[in-house]
Amino acid sequence: MGKKKLYILSFLLFWSVAIIAQNDYSVGQFYDQSLTKERKVLSREPVRGDDVIWEAKIWRMIDFRERFNQFFYYPYEKEGIEDRKNLVYTVWDAILNNEITVFEDDEFKIPIDNELIKKRYTKIDTLWLEIEDDEGTVDYQAVIVPKEFSSENIYQLVLKEVWYLDKEISAVSVQILGIAFVMQDLRADEDGEMELRGSVTLFWVPLMSENVKKLLANSFVYRDYNLANMPSWEEIFYTRYFNSFIIREDNIYNRYIKDYYEGTDALKEAERIESALFHFEIDLWEY
């Protein structure tokens, strides 16, 4: 009798543990993913202003259409992608939820009200409905249909970063200060065909903000070769896991490279700046 009670008790205990474990896991998963869902912001050694003896500000462009950078762009659909989000929707949803503040300028001095952001980038379509009354008279009524924000035409990302020499560690380091999404301005011509009218910088996201750091540290990047260990967006930027090209260095005229060079000359200027940054630290120790 005692053994029977012991078996029953063991069975009930096992069953209750199984039920609790099942409730902990998300539907569609076979193991607890809490370790990959809750991450702390990467710790960095603080930099003292007195230790910075040289610095240079650089603006560079990441093009999502480049094969290596396509994980920034996909998935550009917002619905039906499980928990996957591209970088644009990661930031956009945080704006909608009032979790972060974005700025008009790359100096991060002019904050944009989140409600204004929603109105600015939510498009409006006008549909005309044909209404016929009992007497056969036809009238037209306009119906305003809001069109949700879409990342489909956002193909580029601008980074603002600072390169600096820290005498405390005798090394050149780099810190990304902020990012900005660039959207293609597509409009219909007279024949109804969409044509590119230019590009628009949407807003600047301050990567030094604690709220933004927390957001990026807990938002994951989909890479199809290892779903069990997906990096966070914070890790992507920290390890500089992207291809990019320089579009501006800090200068007294506040000009971009495209303002004074075109074509191959612009490419050569970008390469010259990149090379100067790369060799700066090496040249310091040459005698």
Language-model regions: role of each:
Residues 195-212:
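Short secondary-structure subsegments characteristic of cysteine-rich extracellular domains
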Residues 1-27:
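Bacterial Sec-dependent N-terminal signal peptides
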Residues 171, 176-194:
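Extended serine/threonine-enriched, polar tracts that run as long, contiguous segments within proteins
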Residues 164, 169-172:
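A sequence/structural signal for flexible, mid-protein segments enriched
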Residues 22-165, 186, 207-287:
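A domain-level signal for the mature, folded cores of soluble proteins
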Residues 152-154, 174-176, 200:
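Extracytoplasmic
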